[in-house]
Amino acid sequence: MTKGILGKKVGMTQIFTESGEFIPVTVIEATPNVVLQVKTVETDGYEAVQVGFDDKREVLSNKPAKGHVAKANTAPKRFIREFKNIEGLEVGSEITVESFSAGDVVDVTGTSKGKGFQGVIKRHGQSRGPMAHGSRYHRRPGSMGPVAPNRVFKNKHLAGRMGGNRVTIQNLEIVQVIPEKNVILIKGNVPGAKKSLITIKSAVKAAK
């Protein structure tokens, strides 16, 4: 069965295992997620569980949003997302970090840091040209393609907005779960800036 939870990225730190191994970890704070709606094939055409995370002031919510969360007897939520293949949950129930345990393999989704307008070297990893000896080609994108089509093909590596994309890193290991602090420690780094929304769910391609 799939497990999933929403949280916020706190930052990175490092821990030592009992064997003395040094592990860099990302700290994810995941306060209890509230189930707002259970979608079924009969009512919605597909099966999913809609959860809400991070309370917000009622004055910031409109009347339909307040009525939607009132069915779960909870406060309006800042983030609302859906998880599929999750069973055994009812409207108003909570998903906590205790649903995960150390050693679980998960997929983590976040929004990568925005870098603004960048050139092809930083954005696509393109090699630069010679910097001396009369060269007039340094950090430019290079050839636009052959003459015959009379146009530039799609997906040509050019300068542009970099970052700010939805990124998923697969098969990350949960090192430790701290229920009293609503914290999950994940091995390695995860996409996103501090305080950004992070989605954690069971790995799709985990080794059987």
UniProtKB/Swiss-Prot annotation:
Source organism per UniProt = Streptococcus uberis (strain ATCC BAA-854 / 0140J)
Entry-linked InterPro entries: Ribosomal_uL3, Ribosomal_uL3_bac/org-type, Ribosomal_uL3_CS, Transl_B-barrel_sf
List keywords of the entry alphabetically.
Ribonucleoprotein, Ribosomal protein, RNA-binding, rRNA-binding
Q: Which GO terms describe its molecular function?
A: rRNA binding; structural constituent of ribosome
What is the top-level taxon of the source organism? Bacteria
Q: Name one GO biological process term.
A: translation
Q: What does this protein do?
A: One of the primary rRNA binding proteins, it binds directly near the 3'-end of the 23S rRNA, where it nucleates assembly of the 50S subunit.
Disulphide bridges in this chain? none
Q: What SUPFAM superfamilies would the database entry show?
A: Translation proteins (SSF50447)
The cellular component terms of Gene Ontology attached to this UniProt record, alphabetical and capped at eight, are:
cytosolic large ribosomal subunit
What is stated as this protein's family in its record?
Answer: Belongs to the universal ribosomal protein uL3 family.
Name of the protein: Large ribosomal subunit protein uL3
- PROSITE patterns in alphabetical order: RIBOSOMAL_L3
From the UniProt entry, list the residue stretches annotated as the region Disordered.
Answer: 123-147
Question: What is the gene called?
Answer: rplC
